[in-house]
Amino acid sequence: MTAVLLWGFKMNNKDELLRRFLRYVAITSQSNASVESVPSTKGQTELANLLAKDLEELGLTDISVDEHSIVYGTLHGNAEGPVVGFVSHLDTVDVSLNPDIHPQVIHYEGGDVLLNKEREIYI
């Protein structure tokens, strides 16, 4: 049985971790430079609310999402030591990408990775 550690919580298989990750990346969270408010798109709020729900399921406390879609939560430690904070952003840069997202898992074995066959885009 495979065990994956996510935020200090043991998950019984890597498929659950992958499932969560694919749910996150499937949400259109591109920023909109023409909007002056934060968040600039509904997708950013959707992702923040999903993350808050998942953090609660993982056992974190004091979870909240503020008016700017900033997610807060507390994971209590089990030993004395300094407090650690994690900071990240939910949006992706709007570079006129298609908001219709189709995440894929590629088992990399070296060489170029084909991203778009029609446009011949590789990384």
Identify the role of each PLM range.
Residues 1-10:
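Short, Lys/Arg-enriched N-terminal segments with co-localized hydrophobic residues
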Residues 14-42:
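N-terminal capping segment at the start of a domain
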Residues 43-52:
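Short catalytic helix/loop segments, enriched in acidic residues and glycine
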Residues 58:
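Conserved dinucleotide-binding and phosphotransfer motif residues
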Residues 61-69:
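Short, well-structured beta-strand/strand-turn elements
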Residues 73-80:
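Short beta-strand-to-loop junctions in surface cap/lid or active-site-entrance loops
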Residues 81-123:
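Active-site metal-coordination/substrate-binding segment of hydrolases
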